[in-house]
Amino acid sequence: MLDSKLLRTELDETAAKLARRGFKLDVETIGKLEEQRKSIQVEVENLQSTRNSISKQIGQLMSAGDKEGAEKIKQQIGSLGSDLDAKKIELDAVMAQLDDIILSVPNIPADEVPNGKDENDNLEISRWGEPKSYDFELKDHVDLGEMGDGLDFASAVKITGARFIVMKGQFARLHRAIAQFMLDLHTEEHGYTEMYVPYLVNADSLFGTGQLPKFGKDLFHTEPLTEKASDEEPRKLSLIPTAEVPVTNLVRDTISDEADLPLKMTAHTPCFRSEAGSYGRDTRGLIRMHQFDKVELVQITKPEDSMNALEELTGHAEKVLQLLELPYRKVLLCTGDMGFGSHKTYDLEVWVPAQNTYREISSCSNMWDFQARRMQARFRRKGEKKPELVHTLNGSGLAVGRTMVAILENNQEADGRIAIPTVLQKYMGGATHIG
């Protein structure tokens, strides 16, 4: 969430920055609430000061042996206490309204993020690789998978429902190989520590990374979600929409040493999304699923290092595509297409031949201090007493299912076989083709 001080001292400037991403900050309501807060705060402080002064008088009278005088003044203390409690309740109510507003406010975009309404206004930064030309009729990954009896959508529908998949044989092995390759690359060459994390998380974790309270409908919950998780209600949990949630929350309520930063973590997990609002989109194939695997990259950095870290993290995701020899493009998301908590985001879009277009396969974001403030994730500089908020970054490195789509379609051959990328062959028992 944003620093509440921005709504107190830079309200108009903050509203103008948020307007770039199409968000209208209710300046009038915030201004009125802030005036109420200041007024009530002054009353609370005056009542506290008066009570302290009277308490001091009582102590002096008691020391002087004037018990009768002390008792008379004590009656005033009782009345002041009631008034003070009432004002504190008023103050809490106003603060709660301000907190509700702050929690609904997205992150401020970086200055270099282009203005825009939607994905059509994103800025292409670069391209890598050239889409192949084929002298035969292309098949999409669904047809290729069904030809090889490796992608079984019908069984998944029977077992669970739409937007799920059963993989078999070499297709299942390819799916596993892709994830293993990504983890090995990121841990052995890019310096990430592999993490195994829970696939179920509590409400505090989802609040920390920004999914709650705004995006609860996009999640799968084991039971109706409570605002606060507790040991007495351990089953009121949610399936993770991304490993970003459990991995980033590892630093919640912690103070790291400056020397330990940056923290670089990676995890391979299934991800679960209800895809609310996407009815009718990408209904065929593996592009948009309720359950899909992803290798996530997370970095925790000092504030001054986070922008360089975003370039590095994005480069790590790009390296996966380059080693797999998959054509892709890198785009800088415009203000209208950014995620709720993002300060700056790059998308990597891989070439999907059957659709004759580029499709998102990775989203890499600098969340600035937006998540850290929610999580109270901090660090302490050497020689300093006061801790500071860290910056958090995350990105897909990559989405496994969409990577598989790209491999199947880009590497198909005229006889229906699929060429296995060289870097994956050792994970496939030395096989060079599927089919």
Curated annotation (Swiss-Prot):
Subcellular location(s) of the protein: Cytoplasm
Gene Ontology BP annotations: selenocysteine biosynthetic process; seryl-tRNA aminoacylation
Ligand binding (L-serine): 242-244, 296, 396
Keywords associated with the record: Aminoacyl-tRNA synthetase, ATP-binding, Cytoplasm, Ligase, Nucleotide-binding, Protein biosynthesis
Recorded GO MF terms: ATP binding; serine-tRNA ligase activity
The keyword Aminoacyl-tRNA synthetase is assigned to this record: yes
Residue ranges the record marks as coiled coil: none
UniProt xrefs under InterPro entries: aa-tRNA-synt_IIb, aa-tRNA-synth_II, aa-tRNA-synth_II/BPL/LPL, Ser-tRNA-ligase_type_1, Ser-tRNA-synth_1_N, SerRS_1_N_sf, SerRS_core, tRNA-bd_arm
Cellular component terms (Gene Ontology): cytoplasm
Pathway this chain belongs to: Aminoacyl-tRNA biosynthesis; selenocysteinyl-tRNA(Sec) biosynthesis; L-seryl-tRNA(Sec) from L-serine and tRNA(Sec): step 1/1
Enzyme Commission designation: 6.1.1.11
Binding site for ATP: 273-275, 360-363
Enzyme class: ligase
Main location: cytoplasm
Pfam families with a match to the protein in the record: Seryl_tRNA_N (PF02403), tRNA-synt_2b (PF00587)
TM segment ranges: none
Reaction(s) this enzyme catalyzes, per UniProt: tRNA(Ser) + L-serine + ATP = L-seryl-tRNA(Ser) + AMP + diphosphate + H(+); tRNA(Sec) + L-serine + ATP = L-seryl-tRNA(Sec) + AMP + diphosphate + H(+)
Membrane found in the keyword field: no
UniProt note: domains: Consists of two distinct domains, a catalytic core and a N-terminal extension that is involved in tRNA binding.
Subunit text: Homodimer. The tRNA molecule binds across the dimer.
NCBIfam families recorded: serS (TIGR00414)
Family listed: Belongs to the class-II aminoacyl-tRNA synthetase family. Type-1 seryl-tRNA synthetase subfamily.
Function: Catalyzes the attachment of serine to tRNA(Ser). Is also able to aminoacylate tRNA(Sec) with serine, to form the misacylated tRNA L-seryl-tRNA(Sec), which will be further converted into selenocysteinyl-tRNA(Sec).
Identification of the protein by name: Serine--tRNA ligase
Organism: Vibrio vulnificus (strain CMCP6)
